[in-house]
Amino acid sequence: MVSMILAAAFWVVLHFVAAGPLRPRVAARLGEQGFRGVFSLLSAAGLAWLILAYRVAPYVTLWQAVPGAAYIAMPLMFVAFLLLAFGIGAGNPTLAGADMLLKDQLPIRGITRITRHPALWAFALWALAHLLANGDLAGVLLFGAILVTALNGMVSIDRKRHRALGQGWEAFAAQTSRLPFAAILAGRNTLHVEELPPWRAAVGTALFALALWLHGVIGVSPIPS
């Protein structure tokens, strides 16, 4: 369990440091591309450590499984995969390296109308779904670490973009929201379903089906019985 605790701590500290006041100084020495490269390598190593430590960690019960958790986790997982499919590569200035999208025009369309952080919400919902279904210490460390860094990532990205882009970011943020559907419900934007490509919905659904199949392969079925 020591390795699991250290892996979770490394993951959280890495992401908080990368989003904190040390980032500009490190990026100044390595260059922005160099910083992103090092951070990506460390993140990959941290994720591998988390997974390997989780697989060998002893099962320590913290609480019994939440009654009906599977009925909550399944829809959360489906939404998470849809957000991931719609968010990745969809032209969002909150993604790494996409700052220049705000230079020409506000890219407020599609999933960005719903939330400006679709991919991070995908990871957050994925982690939350697994927290509901797992009440053991190793599960809480793994999924809790991912949930915390995903939620903190939204805040830190917004702050970084605001510092870098100023009024361009303020105009973008005024018409979008961190919380899904908040800008639409507040009347700051409108939902246009026709801007959500059906093929992305198909990809999200396929990923969800693949995840269900993989759970069966490892002997852990998420389907309510």
For each of these PLM feature ranges, what is it?
Residues 1-13:
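Hydrophobic transmembrane alpha-helical segments in integral membrane proteins
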Residues 14-20, 82-97, 156-164, 170-171:
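Membrane-water interface of transmembrane alpha-helices
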Residues 16-35:
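Membrane-interface helix-loop junction between the first two transmembrane segments
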Residues 41-112, 116:
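Portal/gating segments that form or line small-molecule/metal binding sites
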Residues 107-119, 183-205:
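Loop-to-transmembrane boundary segments
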Residues 112-167:
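A contiguous pocket-lining binding segment that forms or flanks enzyme active sites
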Residues 159-196:
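Membrane-proximal soluble regions of multi-pass membrane proteins
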Residues 210-225:
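Juxtamembrane boundary at the C-terminal end of a transmembrane helix
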